[in-house]
């Protein structure tokens, strides 16, 4: 699966309709970005190995309190649910996790990250 295919799939999510999604760089203030997919190899406890593609989707947003943080977490949770229900053609979503922001930037924004792992079928 190509980066372009993954990017187009991500941008087709209803919650991103009309939003600009930067590819491989963070927006200055409020916005969305997606990292270039990284190929990962994992091994289970029995020694079986499989490959997947990992992408991080970042939501950078101005935050003034916990209500804002909860609203952003809901946005990412809805995107995670959509991704699991509508995986890219020929793939399945094997992991989808949301990371809490580590710190507030000088501009007053926080970065919330959704990590998706896609396994090609």
Where are these regions (language model features)?
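Charged, amphipathic alpha-helical segments and their flanking helix caps
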Residues: 1-25, 38-121
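A short, hydrophobic beta-strand-centered structural micro-motif
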Residues: 30-36
């Amino acid at each position: 699966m190509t980066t372009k295919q993954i990017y187009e799939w991500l941008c087709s999510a209803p919650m991103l309709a009309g939003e600009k999604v930067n590819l491989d760089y963070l927006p200055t203030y409020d916005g969305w970005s997606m990292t270039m997919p990284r190929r990962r190899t994992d091994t289970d406890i029995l020694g079986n190995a499989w490959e997947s593609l990992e992408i991080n989707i970042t939501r950078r947003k101005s935050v003034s309190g916990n209500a804002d943080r909860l609203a952003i977490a809901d946005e990412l949770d809805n995107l995670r649910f959509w991704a699991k229900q509508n995986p890219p053609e020929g793939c399945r979503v094997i992991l989808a996790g949301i990371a809490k922001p580590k710190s507030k930037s000088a501009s007053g924004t926080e970065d919330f990250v959704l990590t998706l792992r896609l396994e090609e079928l």
